[in-house]
């Protein structure tokens, strides 16, 4: 079951893939999700109908999701964030109890980050 995307998730997709959208698609997306304009406000500004705005937003969201399925940038980003959190925890533990095994654990986590790349 797919849960509806939050505004934050949509904005993250936009950050990763906005260059793959047309200028008009970028403008409509930004006006709605970042500037919080209504469909009617966007329609008036762009000289199109509110239904055309809704259709374009639906297409843009579909494209962003499609690009993410193909390229997987959000998953890679989330994995990197999780690894960074693990490194911070390991560093905190190492500060409390310095040991060679702690250094080894951090080195392994850093190598994992480097091998996964983004």
Q: For each predicted feature, which ranges?
A:
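Short, Lys/Arg-enriched N-terminal segment that forms or immediately precedes the first helix
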Residues: 2-17
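Short amphipathic alpha helix immediately N-terminal
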Residues: 23-34
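Hydrophobic positions on the alpha-helical face of helix-turn-helix-like DNA-binding modules
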Residues: 29, 42-43, 53
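Helix-turn-helix DNA-binding motif, specifically the short coil turn and the N-cap/start of the second
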Residues: 49-50
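Residues within the DNA-recognition helix of helix-turn-helix
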Residues: 56-59
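C-terminal flanking helix
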Residues: 61-68
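Intrinsically disordered, low-complexity basic tails/linkers immediately adjacent to helix-turn-helix/homeobox/MYB/SANT
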Residues: 71-99
């Amino acid at each position: 079951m797919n849960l509806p995307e939050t505004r934050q998730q949509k904005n993250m997709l936009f950050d990763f893939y906005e260059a793959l959208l047309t200028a008009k698609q970028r403008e409509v997306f930004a006006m709605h999700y970042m500037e919080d304009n209504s469909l009617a406000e966007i329609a008036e500004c762009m000289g199109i109908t509110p239904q055309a705005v809704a259709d374009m937003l639906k297409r843009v969201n579909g494209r962003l999701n499609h690009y993410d399925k193909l390229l997987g940038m959000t998953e890679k980003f989330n994995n990197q964030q999780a690894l960074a959190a693990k490194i911070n925890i390991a560093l905190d533990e190492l500060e409390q109890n310095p040991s060679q095994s702690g250094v080894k654990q951090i080195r392994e986590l850093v190598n994992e980050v480097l091998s996964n790349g983004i």
